[in-house]
Amino acid sequence: MALRGVRPSAISAAMRTDEQPIRISLFAPNGRMGRAISAAVVEDPGFAIDEDHGDVMIDFSSPTGLQASLDRAVSGGIPILIGTTGLDDFAGRRIAAASKDIAVLQAANTSLGVALLSDLVERAAKVLGPEWDIEVLEMHHRLKADAPSGTALALGDAAARGRETKIKAERGRDGTGLKRGEGAVGFASLRGGTVAGDHDVIFAGPEERLILSHRAESRMIFARGALAAARFLVGKPAGVYSMRDVVEAL
């Protein structure tokens, strides 16, 4: 018997029992993160890849593929995790529009460690006074196309939240007359080798420094974090979610 007004995929997701694996529909499954997530699914019997009848869609593609993945998730009535970085304000508006119909989790980094780092950065920025300058240093592999990394920018946003202000970003300083702006958050990017992702948030105060760091040794940490986010999204009402919500639900 068909249920009027409910998409078939939404019905199947609602009927899934706790004993059945969560079905992952991968957008761009042949990308680096797509392959890593497929490998993580093989490790975890609680998940399965099902491109046609997914309970959750995961998109780690590119900004140009965002609209197609959102359309596919909305038409299927399933939640979506967006791990794509380098998105602009227009992409943000498209995500907000989709979140009226489905649950959307956007994360520049799906590592659970980075989610905790973000909380620590916000806390440190709140506790330490304005005399502590904040710098974000990140390094990634030679093939990464965007800079600063989405994670670095998200950590800068966390610092701004702690200071209860809007971020004043200073990126890639080069030249002369570049005295640090009051209340600025500086960003520096390094590229080389096969580095999966290094991030340091430096709080430089009077005669002391606090450095909060995270080192990603493999893309598998992002893949496992993406599966944790997918598990969180199953059954969630329409709206926008974050990795902080995932960590708080653990």
How should these model regions be labeled?
Residues 70-71, 84-105, 115-124:
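Rossmann-fold NAD(P)-binding glycine/threonine-rich loop
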